[in-house]
C-alpha cells in the first residue's frame, strides 16, 4: 500500500507506530482476550492505563504539582462554557482576546454566562494578517480571567508569546491545536484545555490542566460533567470516560517520550514549517497572507494564484497520497495541518508535489 499523508486539521494523523500497536492489541489487550474498548473503566487494568497516561502527560509538559489534569468529554466547545462556569466565581466579566475564528467562538459562548470584555487583537501589517503583541493587549481591572487561543487552525495564526500579565491575572487558553508541539510554561496559566483530535489522540477526549486554587468556584448551574472539582474528585471518571481515546492518547504520550519529547517535536515542527513556508514564499504561484511573526507551525493555509486550479490541485494531490488539503469553507484555498504525527517526509512529499504542480500549471 502506498504511503498516505493525512493533512487533516482534525481528526488528524496519528503516529504510524501507535496505530500499529493499537491494531495488534485490538482484540486481545493486555492478555485479557478482549479489547481495551470492552473493559471496565474502573477495573485495575484500565486504571493503570489512566494513571500512566496522566503521568506521561505531566512529564511531557512538566506540569507543576499544584495543577490538576482532567480527562474530559465535550471538546474545545465544551470548554468554552466550562471555563466561565468554573472560573468566574462571584465576578461578572472576563477578558477575551479575539485573534481568530476559535477565539470568537469562545467569546460567543461566554456571553451566555458573563459580560466579556473583548479586545480585538487582529491587525493588518503591509497587507498581511497579524496579531498585536501581548504588551498591547488591553485588559480590564475587574475580570475574573483572560482567555485567548494560541493557535487558530482556520486563520493559520499563532501567538507564541508566553503570557506575563502578573500573578493576579488568571490566564485561560485553548491549546487544542498546539498542545505538545512546543514547550510551554504551564505555571503562567490558570487553565489550559485541549481537544485531543489534533496533537493528542482521537476525537472524543479533552484534556484540562487547571491550577488547584481555581477549583471549588463553579457556578451552581454548572452541569456536573463540566465541573472541574467534581471531575477531579472522581479521577476524571464521574461518568464513563472515552476509554479508547484515553488509551490511544496514552500510547501517543509514550511515542512522544520515546522520540525525544516536546523539545524534539519543537525542532521537527520548526523544520517542517520552514520547508513548507519556504516553498510558498519563493513562489508567485502560491500565497500565504499571514505575517511571518504570527504564522502557525501547525496549520498552514495557502492560496493558488489561479483559484480555478484549486479542484485540480486537490484531485492530483489526493492521487499522490496527500490527503485532506482542502481549506476550511470560511477561507477557501488549501490548508496543510502538520501536527506532531506528520513526519518531515510527509511535508517533503507535499512540497515536492507543489513545486511540480507549479511547473506544469504555473
Curated annotation (Swiss-Prot):
Cellular localization per UniProt: Cytoplasm
Cofactor (UniProt): pyridoxal 5'-phosphate
Binding site for L-glutamate: 9, 42
The organism's taxonomic lineage, starting at the top: Bacteria, Pseudomonadati, Pseudomonadota, Gammaproteobacteria, Enterobacterales
Biological process annotations from GO: L-serine biosynthetic process; L-serine metabolic process; lysine biosynthetic process via diaminopimelate and N-succinyl-2-amino-6-ketopimelate; pyridoxal phosphate biosynthetic process; pyridoxine biosynthetic process
pH dependence (UniProt free text): Optimum pH is 7.5-8.8.
Cofactor binding, note field: Binds 1 pyridoxal phosphate per subunit.
GO CC annotation, single: cytoplasm
Organism of this sequence: Escherichia coli (strain K12)
Record-level Gene Ontology MF annotations: O-phospho-L-serine:2-oxoglutarate aminotransferase activity; protein homodimerization activity; pyridoxal phosphate binding
Name the UniProt record assigns to this protein: Phosphoserine aminotransferase
Function noted in UniProt: Catalyzes the reversible conversion of 3-phosphohydroxypyruvate to phosphoserine and of 3-hydroxy-2-oxo-4-phosphonooxybutanoate to phosphohydroxythreonine. Is involved in both pyridoxine and serine biosynthesis.
Subunit structure: Homodimer.
Membrane-spanning intervals of the chain: none
Catalytic activity: O-phospho-L-serine + 2-oxoglutarate = 3-phosphooxypyruvate + L-glutamate; 4-(phosphooxy)-L-threonine + 2-oxoglutarate = (R)-3-hydroxy-2-oxo-4-phosphooxybutanoate + L-glutamate
EC number(s) per entry: 2.6.1.52
